[in-house]
UniProtKB/Swiss-Prot annotation:
NCBIfam families: MtxBflmRegRemA (NF046064), PRK04323.1 (NF003315). Belongs to the RemA family. PANTHER family: REGULATORY PROTEIN SSL2874-RELATED, REGULATORY PROTEIN TM_1690-RELATED. It comes from the Bacteria. It comes from Heliobacterium modesticaldum (strain ATCC 51547 / Ice1). InterPro entries: RemA-like (IPR007169). This is Putative regulatory protein Helmi_20580.
Amino acid sequence: MDIKLINIGFGNIVSASRIVAIVSPESAPIKRIIQEARDRGMLIDATYGRRTRAVIITDSDHVILSAVQPETVAHRLSAKESVHHGDEATE
């Protein structure tokens, strides 16, 4: 099994296979998800004190805050997947 890791900013890395959603933090429902995760102790703040620009939701119900734009994280995720699929084609 090949573990794919995604850089979410400032040297913080998340397992790509565990990501369920990458969303923007502006909407009220996402703010509610963040607060509920904070209350449950399932919030991981990887912003280094900067503005939250992306909220990453994992399959373990952890909520990760990132200072990187959601589009950037999604691009890194899709780039990793295309590289991985390219490796399979050559095997």
